[in-house]
């Protein structure tokens, strides 16, 4: 359950049409499924929304585990973010999370230099079982395209998949309240997927997260994004130690 909520966040992640100054508001809902052998059960749900606030975009993702899953690992995550309309560049990112016995609050404020540099002023506050475990301000630096865990979802949907060949890779820097990582998108071609009662033609994309020295920081995840003008991620999938988790759009 935790991994798929993080997968939704890490896509990573909605934009209808190609983004521009007149991007309409939208709300997209997902169910989080746990699959292991014959077990196929809904473990949670998530809602991600976008609003045009005039000078910028505001987005929010809310993810919850289902009551039966709460017995094993409770997830109550809320992500908030604001983005410049020009290039979907993030301005502010915030994650409020209750995961198991921990409560976390991460923030990132983005500053852009004239030379293409990006500075992230980050804070991370962690409380476990009522005890303060971390209160860590830090500053992260990057060059070129840089996103957070929420704006990456929109960035992905605006990539020119229709111009890519199978096997093409493109990377972007991603800041969280904890660290800097590289998020690499690998294009796997066009596939058809069945979600609920609908069949979609999709771009299949694999996501890879790496840290310093190219070391993997989490397992790969896969997403299927419609080839139409909406570019909707209709299915996301990640592996667990036992079974796998799948996020499906509610249509």
Where are each of the predicted segments found?
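Sec-dependent N-terminal signal peptides
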Residues: 4-14
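Active-site/ligand-binding surface loops and adjacent short beta/alpha elements
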Residues: 117-175
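Acidic, serine/threonine-rich low-complexity disordered tracts
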Residues: 21-114, 158-251
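Sec/Tat signal peptide C-region and signal peptidase I cleavage site
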Residues: 16-20
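Alpha-helical interaction segments
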Residues: 9, 63, 143-144
